[in-house]
Design a protein with these regions (language model features):
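Glycan-association/targeting regions that enable binding to alpha-glucans and other polysaccharides
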Residues: 121-125, 147-152, 177-179, 185-189
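Surface-exposed beta-strand/loop patches in extracellular or lumenal glycoproteins
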Residues: 145-163
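C-terminal beta-strand-rich structural cap/linker in extracellular carbohydrate-active enzymes
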Residues: 178-210
Length: 210
């Protein structure tokens, strides 16, 4: 909790274009820095995965959407794929045709928008993962890293956006939320015991109003 507060403090690590490489209050922070005062995507991807492990789904979404918006804005304005971003100007910098570090952008987009994509942190291991043909049902066997104490973790599942869904783990309904139709941000229970995750479409009765 304390570390998360540091990461998302606008006086320290958090900026309008993402997480700084170093604390902005540090004496070695530079406004024209390369690695000591800029925003890169690879280290943010690792933070994003860790936030999913900690059950901090909203914070993970904040990291991913800020990165996607930053990338989209720069690409629209310059048509370039820069290495990193300067915090003060919020613009891309470094080599302008640098696609070598673009995989975090692709992974974030897929995690929140590509139907049939399942995303977890480092502590959740999925086996026997299966969607039905129209992506309205999903089942998976899930195991956890038992070297840590049991705690809530977040998993993202992109379903068919035309339906609403109920999520169960080992037969019990678990919490889920969405930022847009089809995306499920699922909060797994505080356990290290393996189990079965099921996502099923639900039908809502709509009374006749004519």
């Amino acid at each position: 909790s304390r570390m998360i507060n540091h990461v998302f403090s606008p006086d320290e690590m958090w900026t309008e274009v993402g997480i700084s490489t170093v604390d902005q209050s540090a004496p070695y922070y530079r406004t024209d820095g390369y690695w000591n005062g800029a925003v890169w995507f690879p280290h943010q991807w690792m933070v994003w995965k860790a936030l999913l492990d900690l059950g901090e789904g909203e914070k993970a979404y904040q990291v991913a959407t800020t990165a996607l918006n930053t990338w989209e804005k720069e690409c629209k304005e310059s048509y370039y794929t820069f290495e990193h971003f300067i915090i003060s100007s919020q613009r891309g910098a470094g080599w302008h045709q640098f696609s070598g570090l673009s995989s975090p952008i692709l992974n974030w987009f897929a995690a929140y928008y590509r139907i049939g994509k399942v995303s977890t942190g480092f502590e959740v291991w999925i086996s026997n993962s299966h969607f039905n043909d129209d992506y309205t049902q999903y089942q998976a066997e899930i195991a956890f890293d038992d070297s840590t104490v049991p705690h809530q973790r977040t998993i993202l599942v992109c379903m068919n956006p035309e339906k609403d869904y109920q999520v169960t783990f080992n037969g019990k309904v678990v919490e889920s939320k969405t930022y847009h139709q089809g995306l499920l941000e699922i909060t797994l229970p505080s356990t290290n015991k393996s189990g079965k995750l099921t996502v099923t479409s639900v039908w809502h009765y709509k009374p006749y109003t004519g």
